[in-house]
Each structure stands twice: as structure tokens, then as C-alpha cells.
Amino acid sequence: VRIERHRIDEAALVAAEADFAERITGDVHRMQEDPRPAEGWRAVADSFLDYLGARSVRLPELHGKDAEAALGSAAAAAVGALELTLVPRRQFGVFIDYVGAGVSYGGEFDREEEPEAQDGEAGGGRQNSGRPVGQNDGWSEGRNHGRFEGRCGGQPVGQHRRRNDDTSGWLDALHLAFLASVADRATEVFIEAAPPWRGNEGRADVALVHALMAYVFGHEEGPDGFLPGRPDDYGLVRPDNLLVGRPDDIFGAGPVQDVEKCALIDMVVATLGEGDDWPGHRAALSTLRALAAGDEDGFHRRLARQLKQYRSRAEAGHAAPRSLLPLDALALMAMAHRWRGWDTKVESGYLPRALVTGFEPDAPRVRAYGGDKRADAVAALTEDPLVVERPTHPFAVQCLDPSPYDDCAAQEMTRFHDPREDPKALARELMSLMSDQRQRFLVRAALDPQGADPCRDEALVLGAEAGAGALRLARAEPGTEVDVTVGGTTRRLPAWRGTFRPNPHQWQQAVALALVLGEREVLADCVLIEPGFFAEGDHPSPGGAYCAALHDYLRGVDPEPAMDHALLIGGRADTGGFLAPPVVLLSQLVQGDRQGFVLALADALEEHREHYTVGARGKDMEAALNLDVLGLVCHARRLGWPVAVRSPYLPEGLLP
């Protein structure tokens, strides 16, 4: 079945994409002062959806990190808006990965509008478990959460006070959260914010809310707040085995099974009576019913009918670009694909593949330690070097003047050369000197990735020497003095312990510069740092684990335990807007797999490129080069390994 989408005015599509990164960044920052934040975050979510709808015209599958980040950010904004409707509210934050910014809330908005405290709510407050939203608090994680036990903060779930019953906001937030694979993190919010069934009988939108709560979260409101009757009252036929071994009540304690979910959906639908289906909630209920029953053919028939009805409604007015993405149908198809493994039998631009599959990535060319090499990738290596292109950096397009970076470097080095400068101040500023030279290096690389640029090379030398000097001081005993050489000048500087001591992230930057430079003494200052420097505590990070593995590899001890740990942490972590370190690439060096290194290198460079397609990230100087990757490549070349990858990310003038 093929269902074409309705058309959107070209001017609206262009406007939705034009300068989007700058516009949405401004909108998110203005949310810090928005007096009506729930409405503001809904508008932010709509802007992301307009952008995605417009992009889907050029990119029908909506693949890529930019679309993934935009969808996740739309979900974050929509869920945040929903949580802001709860009274009283817990402390929480809305963070927009696409922009790298957000707002924290502590329940300070509209407190004067709260009704008087009721029994069990001293001063209008609500007891909070203290757990982050989405953490296990009475229900299990995963697809079948089991029933939430009906209490949250001392009240029946679903009966907390709300300033409004914004059912459309609830539905949009749930659909977006599911598509972005974050619904389970906000389970408590959805259950608390759901409009109650009692008093809303006959409303198809509320019926859809409760049907989705049953199917997605395994939750039903409970005998006092859910359906005003029993299945028999609606002429429904219950399977004989539905009540085997349990009381004669489908609302008894325990998880809501699929057969019960079907019964619940039938019951809410039976209360609706006759009526039209604007804006399509009845059709969505019908599609959801087939999904719950496991009726694949019926599901796709109803989904096709749902989309045809949707198109007819959309064609009747001046629709916004976001109308190209019907969230209800998309979420239902995503549930069918991700939970039941059903392929999409309805061909339509309304159902971009990446949104349905959850942005399933392509299989990597190689996995850790040279495992599972893709046959096509290995075959490609036998023909020509792999090529990874790099977009022209905005600095080059704008012909950015790099002289301010050079002037800053000259001023810093003048101070370092001056014997009258305070040695303690110079010692404390070594890491700042490294950071400034690193930025200068990246700017120069962005402007001319392949050229022979003496200023770029000078920045590399000065940055690597400054980082190594800071680490040499960090190793020394407090109260002693150490010779540090930067730019041909040696100064005797005092060692100390305190807030200016380098951290593992700065070590990572310093060792990358040292590996690119290839000076043995400079690298030694990085490698000789004590292993305890990388202690992670109770919250290991991908970056810290990578540093520990790289440190073990470079200092010649068995690196596999630390490498295994880094791979484990990297696989578990949600890096959000941060680019993960090249752990798989490092594992090829640990394994000694030359072919695997080349394959992993191509993957790492493509991952870097894709990361910087999101929003305004491409304007960042870090987009020009991945110094972690470049450092490992230079190290491999010095080991004599052939690296059959050609890319502007690997400037020939820097490779050994």
C-alpha cells in the first residue's frame, strides 16, 4: 500500500529550515526568562517538528545525527512542558541536546495559582521519592513495565492535581518520547499527568491516553478511577483463560497482560458511542487495538486507513511543515516494528524509516579487538584506500582571520620568556597555554587542512610542550621545583597540589597533542603520570575510562582489563551531545590488528563528521579535526603500520 503525503507550501518549508540552528538556540536561551514555560516549551517542540517535517521532504528517511538530535530535543521539550503542568512539581530540568543548553526548575512558577492543600498534602506539597524521573520506583523497566502499584507521593497515580487537562500535549509528548526511545525515563510523569478517565467518559482523546498507558506502560488507573463498569457491561467477550487463577476482576494486582490490554482498549472504545473522528483518535485506537492483539495484517490495514483519513484532514487547511509527520501513526508503527518486529507494509513519506526504527545505525566495519569485520568493508580495502570526506569548515568559507590567535600566542610566550614573571603564576597557567595553542592549531587546520602552515605546526609544538610541562609539575612533590621547556625557553617552576592540578580530560588533550607531535620526551611526561590519576569513583565516564586504557597501553602494562572496562562503559553510556572517545580504534592497537585499525579509523572519522552535522556544531573549531583519532593514527604510523585511509581529517603534513 502506497500513501502519498499532502503538500506543504514551499515557502513554509524553506522558512522552517532557514537559520534553524541559530533560531532554536535563541528560543531555548529565552526560556530561562519565559513566564509561561509550559507554553514556551511546547512552541520549542513545534519548531523542532517543523524543522524535521521540512527536512523530510529532502531526506525522506530522516536518517542522521541531526535528525536524531532534533527528535530527541523535541521530545525533551514536550515532556518538559507536560511536567510543568503538574502541581506541585518536583525539581527537574529540560535539557535540549541540539543546542547544548536547558533550564532547571524547582516548582517556582505559578505557586500562587495552586489550590489549597488537601488531606495528605501538607502545604500543597507532594512527597517525592527522591529518585530521578524514570528510575525504577515500583515498576520494572523495559517494554512491559508491569503495573505501577497505584501510589505515587501518597496519592493514587493519575489523580494528582493539574492546572489543565492538556490531552493533546500528553499525546504528543508520549508519541515523541517513544519515537526518541526515552518514554521509559518519564513513566512517572506520563502517569501523573494523564487526564483522569472518570468525568471524561466518551472523550476519544482521553480514551486514547488510557489505552496507551495500558499498552506502553502496563498501567491502568485502578478500580476507583478507571472504567465505570466491567467488561460484561459493554457486551465484551472475555477469553475463558483471562480470569483463570485470579479473582473475577481484571483490575486485580499484577501486570497488565496483552489480552487484558485488548480488553481495556475495547472497554474504553465501547464508552465512546457514535461520532466523527476529528482529529483521528478513534482511528488511532483501532490501530492500537490491532497492535495489542498481535494482528499484523489488521494493524497495517487500519494504519493505512488512519493515514488516509489524516491526509484528507491535512489537505483541508493550510498545514504547517510538522503536519508531514503524524506522530500518532508514527509512534504506533514504531511500536509494531521495535516490539513485535513487524516490517512496515505501508509505504508512505508519513513514516520516515529512521523514526520508525529508532535511528538504527549501520553495522560498524569492525568491532572491538578486530571482531566481526564486515565482508564488504574488507573487500573495499583490497581495491583502494578508504576515503572519508570532510565538509568545508565555516572558518574557511568566511576566510576567518587567524591573527588574533597568533597574537594571543605571542603575548603568552612573551610572558613565559620574561624572567621577571612570577614562576608560580606561569606554572598555574601552563594548562591554559596548552588550551590556547590547541585552539590555535584547530583554527589553522580548519582554514587549510592539507597545507604546510608553519603557524599551525608552531601551535602544535607549543601546546604539546605546555601540556607535558603541566603534567611534569603534577607528578612532582609539592615544594620542589621542576624544569619546564616551552618554545625553546626553560623555566624552573614550582610544583604544587590544588585546584590548578590537571584533570584526566586535560591529560587526554595533552597526550593527543604529544602523539601527533611525536617527541619522545614530551610524550613521556604524559605517560609517567601515576595510574591513580584516572581513579573514577562511583560514576565512571567514557572519557575517563578511555584515558585509563590509553595510559595503560602507552606505559606498557597489560591494557586489556582497562580496555575492556572502557568498551563496557562506552557501550552503556548515553553521551548525549558529547562525542564519545575512539575506544574501538584504540582496541585495534591493543589487539595489534592492522586491518581492524584501518576499518575502525574510517568508522571513527565518519562518526566525528556526523556528530558535527547537528545544529550549529559544525561551526565549532573542534569539527575541523579529531585530535584523539589523529594522535592514534600518528602513533600507528610510527609503529610502521600502513593506514589506508585518505581524508582531510588526516592532514598529510602532520602524518609521520
Where are these regions (language model features)?
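Terminal, non-catalytic domain-edge segments
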Residues: 1-53, 276-292, 300-447, 575-586, ...
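Eukaryote-skewed repeat-based solenoidal scaffolds used as protein-protein interaction platforms
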Residues: 29-126, 130, 134, 138, ...
